[in-house]
């Protein structure tokens, strides 16, 4: 039991007949390009603006000797994730009876904090993201543009949406914090994308120790499986999941007394090797568990990059789950470095309109 998280214990208690964890020897196979490791030898970056910003060697692991809770959060946000990315963005909301809602989309991204970006327009930015819905038909061509800076206090997130009904682009300042997108059906917030993203000012952050825990790792069977095989009642098909004993840095986020968020208390687990978030528990105001999230890691050797194959969010009240950002070997395959850098004109309101069409 010592190696299980509270979220995993809750899964066993809620689904005693179906939830299992297959434990394998630890492989510690994560890797990123050597350039990232070389740049990280200069030591820690600096947190600025009360932790809302970072100043340091672009492309490095910002805090290789992390000691503060937000160091771990920034390491996760700025970990290596490719350069000029092109890929799919499917999602599934699965009900207890096995029925589901599914959707699909396209995404392109420019990750500015990495050693291979030379474009001057990336200065001061984390990156830029564009997404377009392709399914279901009623939402087709609805699109989103997000530009994220390295200092949320000085330069807050900029977001725009394209509405295919009106054929207009408008600013979307509400796409942050606990904004609930229609696709997630209330199972995930804007700041839960990729584990955690965006401003950090609504929480008090604290370290909860470094421990060994069973975590979803090297899930190649899931990556190679037929999509129909992995989507089962209550949770993903655990036949395709594997867990290893992993060293994780645990960080708590507790809502400030003068702030609001539908996730008042969060416990985040950051993999010590890849620096990425690998699991999370969300608690309500009474500190009773609401959601358990897994972000199973896998080494993409062709890049190399060590990233989540999907994000699975399990809600205990409704017994529904959201599976999104699903990557697989056959469909929705990620291109980590496009043949040529993405044009900056793509990541503008006019570019969003062209991209949506």
Where are these regions (language model features)?
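Short glycine/serine/proline-enriched coil/turn segments at secondary-structure junctions
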Residues: 138-139, 151-153, 243, 258-262, ...
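A generic structural motif
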Residues: 132-136, 162, 254-256, 283, ...
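A short, surface-exposed beta-strand/turn
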Residues: 147-152, 264-279
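Short, surface-exposed coil-to-beta transition loops
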Residues: 140-143, 155-156, 261-265, 278, ...
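Non-transmembrane domains of secretory- and envelope-associated proteins
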Residues: 1-55, 165-166, 177-215, 219-238, ...
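Solvent-exposed N-terminal domain segments of exported/luminal and surface proteins
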Residues: 1-156, 163
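Extended beta-strand-rich segments in extracellular/periplasmic secretory proteins, especially
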Residues: 92-93, 99-135, 191-268, 278
